[in-house]
Amino acid sequence: MQNDLIFCMNSYLTYRAIVDHNRQFAPGLTPWFYRHDVARTPVHTADELDRHLRREIQQALENGPVALMLSSGMDSAILASYLPEGTQTYTLHCHAQSSLDETGSARLYAERNGLKHTVVDIYWDDYARYALPLMGRKGCPIHSIEVQVYKAALHAKADGIKTLIFGETADILYGGHSQLLSRDWTLEEFTQRFAFVDVTKVLRHPQKIQSPILPHVQPDGNVDVFGFLNDFEYDVSLGFYNNACALAGMGFYAPYSSSVLGQPLDLDRIRRGESKYLIRQLFSRIYPDLPIPPKTPLPRPMAQWLADWTGPLHPELLPDHIPEFTGDQKWYVYALNQFLREFIGEENYAIPEAGACENPL
């Protein structure tokens, strides 16, 4: 394992993960890399997706007490319809003025299906308490959702639950990332678009890292974005949830993740506003009287919680542009800073000599 602090910082801010599995931040900080190595069932129609999800839920039920992480979105609402009456569900609720409250819609789905419903309240204090243990297990800074999932997993464990069920990867597998799929992107355009933080504004040694995207550059020079998401982002996103559940001693189950779209994604439909068209069809069949809910990310009100945060910063981080970042971008810088200060230290850490960085910016 190569010790490469500079690469790992750049990789995390760009992709929220260390993309080279032979590198680590520093000695003793071996990263935990997640790979979801399961057989994936090809799905062509809403009927096939329905049958697949029913089978997956039945398999989960055979392995002990389960609960569903239920949001206001289609993906978990569909899963709720397959669960036996009385099954426990949990909804995350961040206590911040700017946070979307999904509890009402989630409660409606729970009531429709005769399920128990519990709200897991999330506060900034939870981040102060749980972020560093999650980073320590992972050997890397974390995604902000990991703290929320970890608290929910602890709650579920106290309730006697063995496995938490998530709707994760439905967006990746069925065309939910409509903004990324909205147009064609060249390699350089997509590298800039996908990067979560502009490393030139944060790091003293910024690098351009394109290795996860390069295998998906097509002969015409454009990036196969759907292929990139199914390949790279699939494992990265599942890793967020798995790290949190594993630290809590909770089983993780994602029924969508063992499927794959069995035919080319209809980009024209996506670009006309019909994202996740197979999931839309299935949702409307299960809940014919309900409108298609708007796509919303899991709530994480970092714009409020980190509104005034500016440090103190580790020496490798630059302060000038932090105030202009979005809440989510501030989280990634904050998390990297916490990781560096706690696990790397502010003195006697290895930095490259001038000109030694790979692909410097």
Regions found by a protein language model. Name each.
Residues 103, 107-137, 163-168, 205-212:
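A conserved beta-strand->alpha-helix junction
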